[in-house]
């Protein structure tokens, strides 16, 4: 589903822990890292797509997280011309995204990157809050900066009043 401007509707997911760290996932078979994200299907709300993508990409369900915030507006990024599939119709030139900030309420061990026959990620780790802005692929950097700026006060407030969660190691490889 591509809009009239050539953008694919999409959700992005920032998962944080009680220390204010965020989950950073390594793309399957690659050296690039990013937050979970995925397309919104026809007839699906952004929140429904977020829960579907959350399960497909990291094996978490509604019971494992709580929604802390979502971006006020849709955020867009353009794909580099070399990544645009010019032979498809309609042509998708980028993504327009609604972002969600989630707090992990379950143990880290619940994260499972192997729920799909074609996994998006093969590893993950907790990183400092601003780390992804510097590390994400360049064409997504402005969107990441805007998302993290919008969610910063919510995440920082968690550190002042953290809920009790089970502790677990800071880095996990794929489960399965």
UniProtKB/Swiss-Prot annotation:
<dbReference type="InterPro" id="IPR020476">
    <property type="entry name" value="Nudix_hydrolase"/>
</dbReference>
<protein>
    <recommendedName>
        <fullName>RNA pyrophosphohydrolase</fullName>
        <ecNumber>3.6.1.-</ecNumber>
    </recommendedName>
</protein>
<dbReference type="InterPro" id="IPR020084">
    <property type="entry name" value="NUDIX_hydrolase_CS"/>
</dbReference>
<dbReference type="Pfam" id="PF00293">
    <property type="entry name" value="NUDIX"/>
</dbReference>
<dbReference type="InterPro" id="IPR000086">
    <property type="entry name" value="NUDIX_hydrolase_dom"/>
</dbReference>
<dbReference type="GO" id="GO:0005737">
    <property type="term" value="C:cytoplasm"/>
</dbReference>
<dbReference type="GO" id="GO:0034353">
    <property type="term" value="F:mRNA 5'-diphosphatase activity"/>
</dbReference>
<keyword id="KW-0378">Hydrolase</keyword>
<dbReference type="InterPro" id="IPR022927">
    <property type="entry name" value="RppH"/>
</dbReference>
<feature type="domain" description="Nudix hydrolase">
    <location>
        <begin position="6"/>
        <end position="149"/>
    </location>
</feature>
<dbReference type="GO" id="GO:0006402">
    <property type="term" value="P:mRNA catabolic process"/>
</dbReference>
<comment type="similarity">
    <text>Belongs to the Nudix hydrolase family. RppH subfamily.</text>
</comment>
<feature type="short sequence motif" description="Nudix box">
    <location>
        <begin position="38"/>
        <end position="59"/>
    </location>
</feature>
<dbReference type="InterPro" id="IPR015797">
    <property type="entry name" value="NUDIX_hydrolase-like_dom_sf"/>
</dbReference>
<comment type="function">
    <text>Accelerates the degradation of transcripts by removing pyrophosphate from the 5'-end of triphosphorylated RNA, leading to a more labile monophosphorylated state that can stimulate subsequent ribonuclease cleavage.</text>
</comment>
